[in-house]
Amino acid sequence: MYLPDRIRKKVDKLAYGINSVGMSGASVLCYDDMVLKIGRDAEDHERSKAMLSYLEGKLPAPRIIEACEENGLCYMLMTRIKGKMACAGEYTDNAAELLPILADGIKLLWRVDTHGCPQQNMLDTKLAHARRSVELGLCDEDNVQPGTYGPDGFSSPKELYAWLAANRPDEERVFSHGDLCLPNVFIDGGRISGFIDLGWAGVTDIYQDIALCYRSLVNNRDGKYGTAHPYFDADALFSLLDIEPDRDKLYYYTMLDELF
């Protein structure tokens, strides 16, 4: 495999495994204490660099060792987070252990000082990105929540975007991970050890993370990615966050994510 010199010098002859979890389309090589992400999305590469630099010392997240672009590919070598993904069977088999850890993780995100945050991902920004994805035909219509499209849903991404633009909810600003699904949360020793894939992190509405975390819990409960866990009470997350769930906003931010 070809690697730029500045990356190769750090990893040459080191053993690695391939991480196949995730839907970004990037290749992820896992070394003992480093991770190398290789992809073609230059925008995500720049967003990730900005946010990982900003979050150093503020949140448990990878530290950038080297990052560069060459021949149309983006390379980012980072420190490896200890622990296991929150979607590991030992956690999804035990809601009583997993849910309090996730709730603590969300509260940890909310406590990040947003002064000087390089990314403001409020709805103006998110909807503009969604509109561009629709116009360029980049939206995945297959890997979506049941009912998003079809007889009981929207006829197309264009119709979904129009609904999102016409039904914008009020926004409550907090720091957000941006894609808080279980594979992006790592746990070690019964607590959050780190967050990964922070390209869409920044200031946005409080329900951005709640909605995607809840969706991820429901999908894992229902067996979308493997074994079903029918007694897993995903709704218990809300009481652990000390909130009464706003079902309209949960739906809105889940649907918004279908255009990303």
Outline where the language-model segments fall.
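Conserved N-terminal boundary motif of the eukaryotic protein kinase catalytic domain
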Residues: 10-19
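An alpha-helical support segment within catalytic cores of ATP-dependent transferases
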Residues: 2-8, 111-178, 246
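Short, surface-exposed acidic
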Residues: 153-154, 239-252
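Alpha-helical elements of Rossmann-like donor-binding domains used by nucleotide-donor carbohydrate transfer enzymes
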Residues: 50-54, 101-108, 129, 159, ...
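Active-site Asp-x-Gly
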Residues: 170-176, 188-245
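Hydrophobic residue at the +6 position relative to the catalytic HRD Asp in the kinase catalytic loop
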Residues: 183-187
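C-terminal accessory extensions appended to soluble enzyme cores
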Residues: 252-259
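ATP-binding pocket architecture of kinase catalytic cores
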Residues: 18-122
